[in-house]
């Protein structure tokens, strides 16, 4: 990904002015560039800009720095992806103004893919790290490793993902941020400051962030712990750390029509009158599971991701009801399946084997 190296002293001198250039999304102050094209190439800095109005279709005058050429770390573009305005604008502000952005919300709503698809359209390298309970401080910071040099085994320190990303033009995404271990979270706390330096005590090194380094996170909660019972393993987050996140946006379940449009964008075989009717009924079933969950009648909730999988599985099996049972119903508690089957019956007018009527008859 790196096209070349620039002397540390020169990089240090230019850091502040170049950071400002990236934040403004311009080539430099009036009267000349902060850096010429060769310098920008050496540091892997954005070399173009995109209009939010033209690229994403939202009414906004924001202009975001971007790269003209993608590299191997840029996510693949999904041309059918539908963006949520609030979430997308928050993410774009993170890229344009070096804000630390957290996207919270229920599972399956597209939190991580929103960040990836924004990065894909900016050609901005993006790396995701699943911050589960097994990710340790060593995994993030680095460790000593035995390597072979000149035919001899020697011990050499290898940077973890955090120092590596911190020194490159990478958008680092911490998935499942609220499931991270406390010792790991305190390592991250220092880099939450936009110009904070990362100190590696084992190496007596102080790392300055690359001007194009960006940090994002996704979480099912907002640091207050799991109040729904859906997300076992999540933890409360130190409020001093939460305070360092510049922007926190929520991406929860969308209105019916928007969710149906997302499903149709993915399940193209339903793009006809009959198919649209089926998708609307699928989303209606999902809406009923969410209402039942809110009312305390159901412990499992249907996410937009599940609806998309249901539509895809229905094409595989050629049967909407059978696909529903395999995609969602079998994930539910056995005692709650008659309730979920009733939701299906209300929407589609068909009884499933798990419906209350069939259970009573049997």
Please provide the spans of the model-predicted regions:
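C-terminal engagement/docking regions of AAA+ P-loop ATPases
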Residues: 317-362
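Short, hydrophobic/amphipathic alpha-helical patches that form generic packing surfaces
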Residues: 89-97, 308-313, 325-330
């Amino acid at each position: 990904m790196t096209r070349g190296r620039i002397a540390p002293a020169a990089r240090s001198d230019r850091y502040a002015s170049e950071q400002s250039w990236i934040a403004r999304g311009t080539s430099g102050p009036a009267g000349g560039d902060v850096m010429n094209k060769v310098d920008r190439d050496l540091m892997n800095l954005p070399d173009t800009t995109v209009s939010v109005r033209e690229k994403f279709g939202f009414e906004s005058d924001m202009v975001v720095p971007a790269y003209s050429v993608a590299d191997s770390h840029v996510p693949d573009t999904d041309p059918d992806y539908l963006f949520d305005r609030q979430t997308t604008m928050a993410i774009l502000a993170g890229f344009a103004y070096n804000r630390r952005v957290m996207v919270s919300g229920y599972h399956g709503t597209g939190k991580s893919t929103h960040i990836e698809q924004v990065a894909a359209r900016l050609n901005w390298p993006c790396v995701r790290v699943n911050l589960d309970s097994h990710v340790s401080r060593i995994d993030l910071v680095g460790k000593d490793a035995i390597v072979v040099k000149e035919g001899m085994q020697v011990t050499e320190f290898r940077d973890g993902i955090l120092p590596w990303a911190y020194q490159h033009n990478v958008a680092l995404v911490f998935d499942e941020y609220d499931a991270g271990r406390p010792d790991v979270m305190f390592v991250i706390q220092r880099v939450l400051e936009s110009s904070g330096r990362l100190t590696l005590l084992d190496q007596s090194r102080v790392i300055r962030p690359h001007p194009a380094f960006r940090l994002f996170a996704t979480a099912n909660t907002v640091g207050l712990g799991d109040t729904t019972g859906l997300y076992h393993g999540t933890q409360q987050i130190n409020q001093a750390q939460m305070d360092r996140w510049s922007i926190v946006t929520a991406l929860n379940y969308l209105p019916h029509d928007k969710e149906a449009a997302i499903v149709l964008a993915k399940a193209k075989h339903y793009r006809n009158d009959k198919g649209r009717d089926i998708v609307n009924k699928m989303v209606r079933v999902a809406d009923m599971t969410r209402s039942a969950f809110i009312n305390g009648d159901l412990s499992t909730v249907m996410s937009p991701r599940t609806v998309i999988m249901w539509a895809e599985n229905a094409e595989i099996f050629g049967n909407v009801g059978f696909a529903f049972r395999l995609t969602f119903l079998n994930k539910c508690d056995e005692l709650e399946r008659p309730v979920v089957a009733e939701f299906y019956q209300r929407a589609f007018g068909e009884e499933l084997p798990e419906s209350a009527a069939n259970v009573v008859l049997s």
